[in-house]
């Protein structure tokens, strides 16, 4: 609607210019008056064309400049000066032979009516009237565009009246704690007298904080749907325009609309676009965004706690919000939505599969265990991708193989069937991934390996080793981190042992291993030589993984050198441990690599048999009922800090755009 209004001024000006040009075109090249006798000579000589014969006048053009030679010098000069076409005009006299002459010389002519003063006036009045009408319509349409000066300060939130949000708490799963906290808000909106009778004050504002895709907006709509009250939905970026004072005016207008429909809910999505901490810019004194934020603070102080208007907002960057916005009395209640655990993921999947047709072999528990770290939006996407995959194969229902493909695609990207690798590269990749898988199987604190593949996927992954945590963990021990270092270096060391050379494919492994070792030394106090002091970056990152928000090392140069030396020591010790293991288990390494070269994919059960040198059956149908997953003890979500080692990938060195771990979203 706003873009349509933005076109209006341009359209009006364009129409006016076109009409004006047409008028000027009719007035251009004025006709030169000549005598009728000269006209008769030119007609007899066949020097005329395009005649227009009216009851009182005859107009036309000369066929060439040389035809003007038959005219008096003054008329000839006037015609030439006017330029092409050489137009002339003469007063018509009674001449019965004129038509015969024109017919004999083959001159084109047509009849016309005389111009009247009414026609001339209409030719000017009509364009002006059209212009005025369009301009008036534009001004009277309150769309808030650049030409709509009267409505530029009006807020235009989406308003869902009563329970028409279409969402209630039954549509929300996996975040039971957040729903429980909001039950009080719903109860107040349904029966405010219950709280006012005892003098209680409902929170003025509720701030929902969570990573992208965790369901913040959905939760706010569910509150309105449960309470059955109007729901004003807008975003933080919609308040700020190019005009000074527009944002503040829209904030005032939004709260005025809400007061008229109380009890109701105002929901501002992406609050960080509006509520950033003030004074951070060079021109902060005249910053339009700061004026808008100031007005929001004033409005939140202005309406009463029991007025029935509740402000809800959502953000995934709470660390950059202004402290004045977060104090009690404004956003009194902060609700954090974390990534769902195993039970939460299963509940979320059960909601999303209600509208799809599932096969008898689909096990939501196994799917939940295979998607650690996934948020609600990720799980919804997996269900949709599985449905699309099944539809492409014309299946009557979605089975586990469709979900397997959807999960692999979400973790590592689309399978790159068009990428053709040489036999030498395949051998390198197979031994690299075999090294990761073998070390993961031999370490007591390593997560089980779900799948090993040398099929290229995504932008840069040439192969991957997919690990899935066995349980929800929020604290990691030093022994677990050391085992993870070993797994990350398994691919690189395997190349050294088998080929006596190394490749560029371990780039991502080395980056992650170095980062993990740095955290152990500088943040977690896991180095005896450095001690218990921490020298890590200030924790300003919050939920937004932006590198520019991180500070530098808070230590002296000598301490930084010692930290670097300790990181090198940890990596060197991990390298030695991995090297000893792979040399001792060289046979298992070759068996895994050989199986990968033949079949391209190894699942958990086959990997265990290959490591233990047991007979390996040919690849066939997957174990019914998720037996493989049950035997492997595959469980739930990754630990929080540090980032989960979900997979080790061999990456294409020519594609450095994506160095993130595709296997387990963080």
Curated annotation (Swiss-Prot):
The active site is at 433. Its cofactor is Zn(2+). Its EC number is 3.4.24.-. GO terms for biological process: protein catabolic process; proteolysis. It comes from the Bacteria. It is an enzyme of class 3 (hydrolase). It is found in: Cell inner membrane. SUPFAM superfamilies: FtsH protease domain-like, P-loop containing nucleoside triphosphate hydrolases. Residues 28-116 are periplasmic. Homohexamer. In the central section; belongs to the AAA ATPase family. In the C-terminal section; belongs to the peptidase M41 family. This is ATP-dependent zinc metalloprotease FtsH. It comes from Burkholderia pseudomallei (strain 1710b).
């Amino acid at each position: 609607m706003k873009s349509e209004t933005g076109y209006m001024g341009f359209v009006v000006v364009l129409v006016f210019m076109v009409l004006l040009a047409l008028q000027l075109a009719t007035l251009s090249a004025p006709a030169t008056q000549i005598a009728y006798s000269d006209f008769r000579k030119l007609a007899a000589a066949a020097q005329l064309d395009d005649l227009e014969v009216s009851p009182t006048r005859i107009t036309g053009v000369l066929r060439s400049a040389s035809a003007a030679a038959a005219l008096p010098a003054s008329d000839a000069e006037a015609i030439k000066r006017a330029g092409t076409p050489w137009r002339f005009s003469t007063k018509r006299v009674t001449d019965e032979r004129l038509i015969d002459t024109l017919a004999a010389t083959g001159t084109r002519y047509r009849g016309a009516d005389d111009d009247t003063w009414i026609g001339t006036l209409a030719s000017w009045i009509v364009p002006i009237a059209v212009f005025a009408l369009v301009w008036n319509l534009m001004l009277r349409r309150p769309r808030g565009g650049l030409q709509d000066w009267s409505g530029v300060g009006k807020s235009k939130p989406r308003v869902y009246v009563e329970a028409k949000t279409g969402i209630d708490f039954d549509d929300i799963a996996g975040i039971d704690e957040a729903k429980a906290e909001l039950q009080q808000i719903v109860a107040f909106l349904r029966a405010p007298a219950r709280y006012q009778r005892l003098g209680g004050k409902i929170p003025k504002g509720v701030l929902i904080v969570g990573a992208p895709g965790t369901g913040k907006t959905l939760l706010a709509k569910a509150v309105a749907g449960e309470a059955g009250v109007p729901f004003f939905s807008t975003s933080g970026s919609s308040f700020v325009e190019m005009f000074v004072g527009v944002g503040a005016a829209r904030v005032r207008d939004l709260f005025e609309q809400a007061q008229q429909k109380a009890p109701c809910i105002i929901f501002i999505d992406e609050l960080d676009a509006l509520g950033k901490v003030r004074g951070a810019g060079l021109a902060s004194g005249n910053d339009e965004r700061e004026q808008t934020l100031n007005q929001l603070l004033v409005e939140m102080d202005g309406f009463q706690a029991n007025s029935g208007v509740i402000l809800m907002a959502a953000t995934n960057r709470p660390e950059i919000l202004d402290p004045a916005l977060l104090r009690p009395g404004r956003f009194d209640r902060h609700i954090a939505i974390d990534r769902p655990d195993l039970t939460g993921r299963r509940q979320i999947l059960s909601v999303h599969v209600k509208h799809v047709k599932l096969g008898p072999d689909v096990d939501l528990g196994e799917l939940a265990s295979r998607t650690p770290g996934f948020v609600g939006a990720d799980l919804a996407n997996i269900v949709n991708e599985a449905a699309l995959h099944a539809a492409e194969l014309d299946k009557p229902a979605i089975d586990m193989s469709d979900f397997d493909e959807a999960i692999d695609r979400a973790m590592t990207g689309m399978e790159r069937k068009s990428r053709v690798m040489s036999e030498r590269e395949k051998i390198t990749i197979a031994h690299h991934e075999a090294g990761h898988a073998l070390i993961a199987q031999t370490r007591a604190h390593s997560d089980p390996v779900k799948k090993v593949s040398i099929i290229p996927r995504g932008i840069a992954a040439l192969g991957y080793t997919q690990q899935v945590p066995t349980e929800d963990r929020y604290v990691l021990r030093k022994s677990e981190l050391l085992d993870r270092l070993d797994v990350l270096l398994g691919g690189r060391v395997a190349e050294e042992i088998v080929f006596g050379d190394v490749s560029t494919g371990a780039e991502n492994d080395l980056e992650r291993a170095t980062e993990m070792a740095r955290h152990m030394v500088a943040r977690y106090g896991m180095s005896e030589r450095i001690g218990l002091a921490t020298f890590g970056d200030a924790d300003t990152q919050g939920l937004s993984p932006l590198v520019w928000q991180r500070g530098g090392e808070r230590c002296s140069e000598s301490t930084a050198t010692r930290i670097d030396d300790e990181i090198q020591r940890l990596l060197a010790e991990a390298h030695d441990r991995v090297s000893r293991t792979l040399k001792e288990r060289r046979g298992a390494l070759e068996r895994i690599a050989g199986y990968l070269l033949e079949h391209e994919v190894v699942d958990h059960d086959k990997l265990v048999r290959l490591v233990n040198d047991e007979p390996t059956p040919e690849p066939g149908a997957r174990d019914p009922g998720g037996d493989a997953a049950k035997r492997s003890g595959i469980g739930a979500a990754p630990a929080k800090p540090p980032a989960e080692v979900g997979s080790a990938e061999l990456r294409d060195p020519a594609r450095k755009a994506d160095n993130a771990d595709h296997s387990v979203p963080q």
